[in-house]
Amino acid sequence: MRAARFYGAKKPLVVEEVERPKPKQGEVLVRIFACGICGTDVHIAIEGLFPTLFTPITLGHEGAGVIEELGEGVSDLKVGDRVGVYPGIPCGECSLCRSGKDYLCPKNMILGIFQDGCFAEYVVVPKENLFFLPDDIPFEAGALLSDAVSTAFHATYKRAEITGGETVSVFGCGGLGYHGVMFAKALGAGKVIAVDVKDELLARAKGVGADFGINPKTEDLNQRISELTDGDGVDVAIEFVGNPEVVLSAMRGLKRGGKLVIVGIGMERVTLPPLRVFVGKELSVLGSMGYAKGEMEKIFALISEGKVDLSNSVTDILSLEDINEGMRKMAEKDGNPIRYVINPQKTT
């Protein structure tokens, strides 16, 4: 089969023939029809921020496709089922796994980092790592559901706990932030304020639910948030950038008792405001990582109710042979992509 192989940081991925994997007991072979190019893939291949367990390795952890073959002992699935692939393989034994937070498992084996991933015609995963994909959801949207979409949902639903009426600011309106705006509105936020340094991304955010857009390069951010909240500040700020300065900007806009949820990942240290301010205002700062498997049904419900529309979430569908160009465009934000999706079954 064909697969896009990673040989080292800052080197192009190599599309080559590799042996098709065989499912072992409890495993499933999935024929991949879509795999999203995630920011993590860019961090690994182009920026060299994260190492993989070994090289060469097949990257890609946002996969969706059709079950091709069942390993021994798999009886609750069948060949031909449409499925999405959960990106992490947890240990299943630790206290976090037993409490339903397996996405935080310290032994989580992420596809494309610890074992071969989904930038290939086929992938093998444990049966527990699959979710059924409804017939009315295309594979490319299913691929995004496995990470990009669900990560944003977890941040808004579980961590920010948006239930209705809140004023929410969303910092960074790229792929994750775009969906963060969408879910904040779908969950009932009374007012959603999008913040980004690109006017085109603010316009796009308004198209999926943002009531206001602020460009800090051309407007006074603090003053504008104060105006939009009658001087109170926002109930919740969600940061999708991973930049210390953006984190602090988001925190400054919180009302007393407000909550900041940080989704963006970066390597730089964040300095808290003076404790007199931080404690005195009873501010909360939370990290948000991944999502729980049980949250997928809530996302499906929002889609079926028409509150969430993923039809514009895919910028383009590329072949494996075009993966390096897709990675470049994601890294350079060329054309402000939401997500490029690779279809390994597609040929140039």
What spans do the regions from the language model cover?
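Glycine-rich beta-strand-centered segment in the early N-terminal region that forms part
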Residues: 19-35, 48-95, 134-137
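NAD(P)H dinucleotide-binding glycine-rich loop of Rossmann-like/cofactor-binding domains
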Residues: 91-171
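Mid-domain Rossmann-like dinucleotide-binding core that forms the NAD(H)/NADP(H) cofactor-binding site
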Residues: 137-219, 223
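Glycine-rich cofactor phosphate-binding loops and adjacent beta1-alpha1 units
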Residues: 160-163, 203-284, 347-348
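C-terminal hydrophobic helical "lid"/dimerization subdomain
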Residues: 248-252, 293-348
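Rossmann-fold dehydrogenase core element
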Residues: 259-261, 273-313
